[in-house]
Structures are given as C-alpha cells and as structure tokens.
Amino acid sequence: MIDNKLKLVIKVVLLIFLLHSLMSIFNLETYIKILAKYQNQIMIIAIIILSGLIIVDIASEVFKKYARTREEKAGEYLTLNYIFKYLVYVCVTLMIFGVIYQNVSSLVVSVGLIGAAVTYALQKPILNFAGWIIILYTRTIKIGDRIFIKNMGAGDVFDIDTQHIYLSELTTDTFEPTGRVLIIPNSYIFTASIENLTKGSPYIWDNIVVHFTLNSNINKAEKIVFESADEVIGNLMRELYEKWSKRKYLISRKLSDKPVVRVGITRSSFYIKALYLVNVYEKAKIRSEINKRILEKVNKENDVKLAYPHIKAVIETENKFKNT
C-alpha cells in the first residue's frame, strides 16, 4: 500500500516538473492566443462530441430495455443498437470535419487523401468492416444464433462488432460448452462456409448410430432403437409435423412425424441408425436420454447384444501320436 502511494507521489511531482519545463521552453501566451482565435470552433466541436456521446448513451439504454423485455427479438435490438451507434459516430466525424474545413474543396481533397492512405494501410480491418456491413444488411448471423464454421469450430453468438464475431465455444459433436470464447474476423463471411443452425428454425436433424453383433435379432434391435427415440422425441416430432405440414413452402416428403430408422452392415456388425428432429440447444440432452433408454432395453433382451471392438482368438489343438 505504501509503495503504491509513493509511486503516485513520484508521478505527480514528475508531472509538475515536466509541465514547468514545458512552460519555460515554449511561449504559452502565443499558444493561448492561437487557441483563443479558434475558441468558437473548439466549443462547437466539444458540444458536437458531447451531444453525440449523450445520444448514443440514451439510445443504448432504450435498445437494451427493449431487448430485456422482448427476449425473442433481443438479438435484433442489440444489432440495431450497433447500427445506430456507428451512424452517430459517422455523423459526428463529418460535422467535426465540416467545422474544421469550412472550405468545401479543401475538405473533399483532405478526405480523399486520408481515405486512400487509410484504405492501403488498413486493408484487413476494412474488409472486416465490410463483412460487418454485410452481416447487418443480410441478417445471415445475429446475436443468439448458434453457428458452425469449418476448421474453426461452433458456438453461440453473443456479440458482433465492426471487426469480429464473438462466440461462446461449443464442442462440434454434441454442442457442449467448453468455457472458451471464439473470436472470428468478420471477413470470414466472404471466405468461409458458415452454417447457421438456428436461422429460420432452431430444429435440426440429428442421428444416433448403434452397432449390434451379427448374431443379434435384427428386428428386436430395430424396434429397441426406434422405440427409444420415439419415447424421447416422438411427441415433439408429431407437433412439428402438424405445424409445418400446413406451410405451403415446405415439401411434405421432407417431413416426418416419427423417428426414421435405417439399417446398415459393417465387416463385424450391423448398425441401426435413428434420425430425428431436435432443438439444436437440446441436442446433447436428447441424445443422452435416447442412449440411456437403448441400453436399458438391450439389457433386458438375451438375443440382442451391442457390438464393440474386440479380438477373438481361436486356438486349435492337434493330438499327435507317435509309434513306439
């Protein structure tokens, strides 16, 4: 505690010394006269900046209030907040340039030169900014969406700014939280394939594959897998079928009111695959419950066995008799 106070005192003394040295070297009266000459412009710029900050602060509170009261559209309100905030910043910047450069031709030339230099030096940030504009305009991604980016990972979007998309990282197989944050440049919208798992509807097709030994009763195995999936997710699929079958733009053959079962064969087993609709946010929970029911049902059957990797050794013995 004493060391911190001592450091603070030293910094204050050093600051006073530096300011005194600066005043002795430069003629401050000259600079004060220059500032006084432009005092009106300085006051106008200060008022513009303060007004812009106040407007942004008030608007942010309004948008956040609506986001809290209408959770289903929270992402849209937060995105509108970003758009409004940066529009205010752009307007404030243009107004400041207008105050400084009263000559329009000088303003245009200055902005052109500055823009060319900035574009060359900040290519990636500008590309990220362009990606941000595309995201806001096309609404392909919004806060609250669950997305997957190839070779990057999956996660829930919790923030989007002018440069990056921020994700709460999830595992790519069961979408379990990892506790990490993925920061994705907005330019990926131009170069990478991004899967939005919740756009339009949070329901996706998931599947469970269960391998059985070749001598298991295939009919019982198929029944076990189907019934386990139907008991867990069947009611939801029937509700969605009733709801979606009334929509004209959906093709009826793509809908199903119950889990779909497929059978396949491998070199050492056969497998039953169950396909079903599930809320993407409950994928891990539903898969776990179906697996649990399958195990419970298999354990009750004598002629149904789960296959697993193993090696079976067959030893043949041969009796040899020698003539004595």
Swiss-Prot record:
Membrane topology according to the record: Multi-pass membrane protein
Entry superkingdom: Archaea
Protein name: Uncharacterized MscS family protein MJ0700
Subcellular location: Cell membrane
Coiled-coil regions listed: none
Keyword Chaperone: no
Pfam families reported in the protein's UniProt record: MS_channel_1st, MS_channel_2nd, MS_channel_3rd
Similarity annotation: Belongs to the MscS (TC 1.A.23) family.
Organism from which the protein derives: Methanocaldococcus jannaschii (strain ATCC 43067 / DSM 2661 / JAL-1 / JCM 10045 / NBRC 100440) (Methanococcus jannaschii)
Major localization listed first in the record, in broad terms: membrane
Keywords: Cell membrane, Membrane, Transmembrane, Transmembrane helix
Chain segments annotated as transmembrane: 8-28, 42-62, 80-100, 116-136
Any one Gene Ontology BP term: transmembrane transport
